[in-house]
């Protein structure tokens, strides 16, 4: 999204600034300041406030809407919607003012004359707009005369015209600058004109700099431009009303009223963190908390409205940034705050899993903790800075600090989490950077600047579109596809354990409860607290966890996302949740969730029986299909959710678990079938000389199996059995060959790929896959008429949709590869391509079976007769 923002300057001039989705208020200030000749040194004194009317003069209450420097321009219409009148032009209007005053205006004159002149014009404008009518007539006339002389001299210099001050219309000058003075009953009109004329003659020879200094000296006592006043109450609650005074000389002080002396509350440079929150539901009052460097307790201040709180917080934050030369400490909802140093997100290449001591162990002295950002069962989480000596750069990271009094079992869980995370490589899973193994143990993780997803949803709920919510679901599901393909279950999938790295990227985190699955595909927990309201029934009742229980939890997580951060089962106790579930109750459909998608979550993902739930790769295909429909602007009520497809493969059974008689009968049937197939092959070879390659296809009992890796494990792609070949014609055999070609190309890509694979070789392998896929689709397009039943047609259409989604996804990833130069991200994207190719092979095999499915009535009859 791009647009133009109109920035008004003092005196009525304005600048148009082009912005995009990443343009911040801070960036606009820098651009405008540079455009009017203000140096980088003085930029920190300036701020922007939102103009809520056609111009600053008609803005009304907009003077209190000061904008956080890290706020994005595109967020303004959403955050301040109730302040912007309906029907106003879409162009965003801002006003730039100097808000953070210097210790000495004369020092500012020496360092940046342009900023000094801007401050003077601002103070004079404030005087004529709001103060002149209640000040002494002599001061008003003198300030007005100084301004007229300066403006006249500037006009003479710019135009080169030969005019004289005596030619000025004195009454018009007074009327334009201080009209209220004309109606002062204490002065006669003729006396006003005479006094004003005398001042003009007196200052006619004064230089512009001297004129500005004299004006500021006069106005300092009248306008009080170096302080701001706020009505507030110290502490929590409106119990001790005072007047707060904020300025470079007063710091943050308070006084009972205007006649009392002020008492200093704190120094502005000591402010370490600013947060504001509503006092209670239904109340306009807000509570501000100021955490101070070196202070044991925070300072609490109650203000009457949220706008007033944000204005005070903005002022205090601006002064501490000016004095400490660091970035914002004001925690405003929805704002990404910067760090002191120039840092970027920690998307550095994870260490190799070999030799944990040397490869992921970090020196504690290279890590500087900055601020507490969260806590959990095993310890607190801090924002920190890690000094990477190899690259000689400082990186913003998150540090999980284990409690010093933690039980050995809890310490073991944290060690296990680090052991798990060092092996995970996925673009939507938080990366482990390293571990400080000495007590207290530290886990150093990739930093997600925007925090937990649940809080982010609550903060940004007014602007988050359905497209973004579905994207979040898709990214989380993609990470689960990867996790399950490595035979791990997460066991704690919830919005609180999803972290937001950017407005369009979320990552799965908190692997403290993750477990590797054994061959039973079920893990039984023996201890620890469990998140009851997110758990599947079998997890609550029997403490059993599997990929199917992860699917249930992901369904609850999706519900949280579409509910914009609402907790599930609100008002229901943990002990009653399982009773509600077993009685058929489920959380209601969120307002933002498409009905068809909610029905899929309710009926499939929240099925009581674990085996009836879809796999995460099937869910991923469904979500991607829904997301594409949303991108195509299909209304939510018209969105369709297809039937989840199951990849066709070999039925795998544990031979030792079969009864002896059944095992013997199975072996005999396979032997007899192999003999019949061999005879039939010989006959077919004689009858059809055009298909010489059929006799090379092995029987079912001797076929070699090609393993194609998919996101859900392996697809055992076996060459088509001779039983199926009985029903093949030339077209069917052509489709089989083309599908085999796709599978062979994918297998070759998977077997040859690693992080060191040359890019040309990788691209050649991918082109081979797409070439074979194109051939297969050409053959398949001519076979749809063979499908006779509606159900079969629906299945074929769904599989084609899955293939199309895979191709779109691969196209997007390949596009990212062309513009991405970071090695770690580059290899992650290439692995994504390999994974998508595996999914393509699965779906192509499924399509082949659907288009060439032989009649099954006779086989069913034979099977039933053997029962």
Swiss-Prot record:
Naturally occurring in which organism (per UniProt): Caenorhabditis elegans
Biased composition (Acidic residues): 683-694
InterPro entries (UniProt xref): Band_41_domain, FAK1-like_FERM_C, FAK1/PYK2_FERM_C, FERM/acyl-CoA-bd_prot_sf, FERM_2, FERM_domain, Focal_adhe_kin_target_dom_sf, Focal_adhesion_kin_target_dom
GO MF, any single term: ATP binding
Name of the protein described by the UniProt record: Inactive tyrosine-protein kinase kin-32
Coiled coil ranges: 662-691
Superkingdom to which the source organism belongs: Eukaryota
Domain Protein kinase: 367-631
Domain FERM: 3-327
């Amino acid at each position: 999204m791009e647009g133009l923002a109109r920035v008004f300057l003092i005196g009525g001039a304005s600048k148009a600034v082009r912005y995009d989705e990443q343009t911040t208020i801070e960036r606009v200030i820098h651009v405008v300041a540079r455009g009017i000749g203000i140096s980088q040194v003085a930029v920190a004194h300036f701020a922007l406030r939102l103009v809520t009317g056609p111009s600053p003069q008609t803005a009304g209450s907009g003077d209190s809407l000061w904008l956080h420097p890290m706020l994005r321009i595109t967020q303004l219409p959403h955050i301040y919607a109730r302040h912007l009148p309906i029907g106003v032009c879409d162009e965003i209007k801002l006003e730039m003012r100097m808000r953070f005053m210097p210790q000495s205006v004369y020092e500012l004159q020496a360092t940046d004359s342009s900023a000094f002149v801007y401050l003077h014009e601002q103070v004079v404008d404030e005087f004529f707009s709001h103060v002149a009518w209640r000040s002494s007539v002599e001061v008003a006339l003198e300030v007005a005369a100084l301004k007229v002389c300066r403006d006249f001299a500037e006009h003479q210099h710019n135009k080169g015209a030969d005019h004289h001050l005596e030619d000025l219309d004195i009454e018009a000058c007074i009327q334009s600058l201080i009209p209220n003075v004309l109606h002062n009953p204490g002065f006669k009109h003729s006396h006003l004109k005479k006094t004003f004329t005398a001042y003009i003659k007196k200052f006619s020879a004064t230089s512009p700099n001297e004129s500005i200094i004299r004006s500021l000296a006069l106005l300092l006592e009248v306008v009080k431009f170096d302080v701001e006043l706020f009505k507030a109450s110290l502490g929590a609650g409106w119990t001790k009303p005072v007047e707060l005074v904020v300025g470079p000389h007063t710091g943050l002080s308070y006084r009972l009223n205007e006649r009392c002396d002020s008492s200093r509350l704190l120094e502005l440079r000591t402010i370490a963190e600013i947060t504001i929150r509503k006092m209670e539901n239904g109340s306009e009052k807000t509570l501000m908390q100021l955490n101070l460097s070196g202070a044991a307790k925070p300072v609490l201040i109650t203000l009457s409205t949220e706008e007033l709180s944000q204005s005070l917080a903005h002022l205090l934050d601006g002064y501490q940034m000016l004095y400490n030369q660091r970035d914002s400490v004001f925690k405003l909802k929805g704002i990404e705050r910067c760090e002191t140093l120039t840092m970027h997100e920690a998307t550095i290449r994870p260490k190799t899993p070999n030799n944990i001591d040397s490869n992921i162990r970090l020196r504690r002295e290279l890590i500087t903790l900055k601020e507490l950002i969260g806590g959990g069962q095993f310890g607190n989480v801090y924002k920190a800075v890690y000094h990477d000596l190899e690259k000689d750069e400082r990186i913003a990271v998150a540090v999980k600090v284990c409690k010093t009094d933690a039980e050995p079992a809890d310490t073991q869980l944290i060690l296990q989490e680090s052991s798990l995370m060092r092996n995970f490589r996925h673009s939507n899973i938080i990366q482990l950077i390293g571990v400080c193994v000495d007590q207290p143990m530290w886990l150093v993780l990739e930093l997600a600047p925007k925090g937990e997803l649940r809080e982010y949803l609550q903060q940004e709920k007014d602007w988050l579109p359905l497209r973004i919510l579905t994207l979040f679901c898709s990214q989380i599901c993609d990470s689960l596809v990867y996790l399950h393909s490595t035979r791990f279950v997460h066991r704690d999938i919830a919005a609180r354990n999803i972290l937001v790295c950017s407005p369009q990227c979320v990552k799965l985190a908190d692997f403290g409860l993750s477990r590797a699955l054994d061959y039973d595909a079920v893990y039984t927990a023996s201890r620890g607290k469990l998140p009851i309201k997110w758990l599947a029934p079998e997890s609550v009742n029997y403490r059993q966890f599997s990929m199917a229980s992860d699917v249930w939890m992901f369904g609850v997580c999706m519900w949280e996302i579409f509910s914009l951060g609402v907790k599930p089962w609100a008002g229901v106790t943990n002990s009653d949740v399982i009773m509600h579930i077993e009685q058929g109750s489920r959380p209601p459909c969120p307002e933002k969730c498409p009905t068809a998608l909610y029905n899929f979550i309710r009926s499939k993902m929240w099925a009581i029986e674990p085996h009836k739930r879809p796999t995460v790769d099937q869910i991923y295909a469904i979500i991607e299909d829904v997301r594409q429909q949303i991108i195509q602007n299909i209304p939510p009520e018209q969105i369709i959710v297809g039937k989840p497809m199951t990849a066709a493969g070999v039925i795998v059974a544990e031979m030792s678990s079969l009864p002896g008689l059944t095992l013997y009968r199975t072996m005999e049937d396979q032997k007899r079938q192999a003999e019949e197939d061999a005879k039939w092959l010989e006959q077919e070879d004689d009858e059809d000389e055009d298909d010489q390659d059929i006799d090379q296809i092995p029987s079912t009992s001797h076929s070699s199996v090609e393993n194609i890796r998919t996101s859900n494990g392996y697809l055992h792609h076996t060459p088509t059995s001779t039983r199926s070949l009985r029903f093949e014609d030339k077209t069917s055999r052509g489709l089989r060959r083309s599908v085999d070609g796709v599978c062979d190309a994918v297998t070759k890509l998977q077997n040859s790929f690693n992080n060191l694979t040359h890019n040309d070789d990788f691209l050649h392998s991918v082109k081979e896959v797409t070439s074979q896929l194109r051939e297969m689709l050409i053959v398949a397009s001519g076979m749809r008429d063979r499908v006779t039943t509606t159900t079969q047609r629906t299945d074929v259409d769904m599989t084609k949709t899955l293939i199309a989604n895979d191709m779109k996804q691969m196209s997007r990833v390949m596009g990212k590869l062309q513009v991405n130069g970071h090695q770690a991200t580059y290899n992650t994207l290439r692995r994504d391509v390999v994974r998508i190719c595996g999914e393509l092979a699965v779906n192509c095999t499924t399509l082949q079976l659907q288009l060439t499915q032989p009649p099954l009535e006779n086989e069913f009859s034979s099977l039933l007769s053997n029962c």
